[in-house]
Amino acid sequence: MSAENKIEEITEDQVPQIEENSTIVIKKEEKAARALISKLNLQKVEGITRVVLKRTRQHIFVIANPEVYKTPTGNSYVVFGEAQHEDMQATARAAQIAAAQAQQAAAETGSVSEAAAAGEVGAELASKDPASITADLEAASLSKDEDAEDEAEADATGLEDSDIKLVMEQANVSRNKAINGLKKNDSDVVNTIMDLCK
């Protein structure tokens, strides 16, 4: 018998259909961690769709669709999932841009419903009382005053450029804020960073 004689023709009907695998592949390390956690008698918490861990005011870590377990004795939680870095300032800027575009579109078309659908700014303002709106406006005017101070070019004489760059990177601030902070703290980089991160 030759190899050519052994080859049989297979039709599509004879090929078994592979079902789509909807199971999640779990890594070996995660499987070991889950086995250890199962020995701790943790209770699975249902209904949590997002976990947010705050690092600083501007930066947060978000875990979407996590598996959350709670200890039976205390108020401690164990969270499984992939953490993603999320920049709060970028998110806020994107929301402001979207709200501004929605207001501009509403002004051009004269339609209030489009602005309400695109941005929830109107609904948020309608639900606030006048005192909180006034407080928000005062806070916004104070931040505009701080921004105006930043726009004026600060004098960097007597300060090292490397110190200014270090403060800018670590505190995530503008060059003018870094210069003003270094002058306020007598060129002390550590105290300046701590002061600007508050």
Swiss-Prot record:
It comes from the Eukaryota. GO terms for cellular component: cytoplasm; nascent polypeptide-associated complex; nucleus. Residues 159-198 form the UBA domain. SMART domains: NAC (SM01407). It is found in: Cytoplasm; Nucleus. Its main location: cytoplasm. Keywords: Cytoplasm, Nucleus, Protein transport, Transport. One of its GO terms (biological process) is cotranslational protein targeting to membrane. CDD domains: NAC_NACA (cd22054), UBA_NAC_euk (cd14358). Residues 48-113 form the NAC-A/B domain. Part of the nascent polypeptide-associated complex (NAC), consisting of EGD2 and EGD1. NAC associates with ribosomes via EGD1. Belongs to the NAC-alpha family. This is Nascent polypeptide-associated complex subunit alpha. It comes from Yarrowia lipolytica (strain CLIB 122 / E 150). The gene is EGD2.
